Amino acid sequence: MKKQSVAFALCASLVCSPVYAKTFVGVLWPMFGPAAAPGLVELVAELKMMPDVEVRTYLHQSWPYLVQDIDHQTPGTRTVVVGYSLGANSSVFVANKAKYVDLIVALQPSMFSWNPSVTGNVGRMIEIYNPNRWMTFGGMGSNKLVGPNIEYIANNDSHPGAQFNPIFRNLVKTEVAKLSTEDEPP
């Protein structure tokens, strides 16, 4: 009888537990990794402090591992990809190979990388870029990605300075917080 009571209590606690969505955030570093992106390192630390948010980081050329991690998330998990510079370029490869990504935020993709159009299953994509290629060292942050569902935000940040822009940082944190509180995926 005691075992049945314990089993019943465990089942009841599981059934009565609140259900909340977990959000997985994959961050794609620029060339030279986190050493070249101290502002992004700070943002990653801030995201890790958010409730129900798991954050993993990847070198831009390791995007296939991010695709694997996204595709192995439990059903109902929200997925976000944040990429800066060549990491933003690599976000397109993630979009085209992953089963589904809720949100991609691409910060100043580089003109010095080949990029196909976004054809993957992405709920929403936001790109922040500087249309003046000379302010981004000849085009390091002025590439416009191509595909459906891309919202473009033009800025006038230098390429190294873009990662410190409060608009970018607040946008990422706000969008992750919104996804974390939604009840169920689309």
Q: Which residues does each PLM region occupy?
A:
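Active-site catalytic motif of lipid deacylating hydrolases and related acyltransferases
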Residues: 22-76, 156-160
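Bacterial N-terminal signal peptides
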Residues: 9-15
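Sec/Tat signal peptide C-region and signal peptidase I cleavage site
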Residues: 17-21
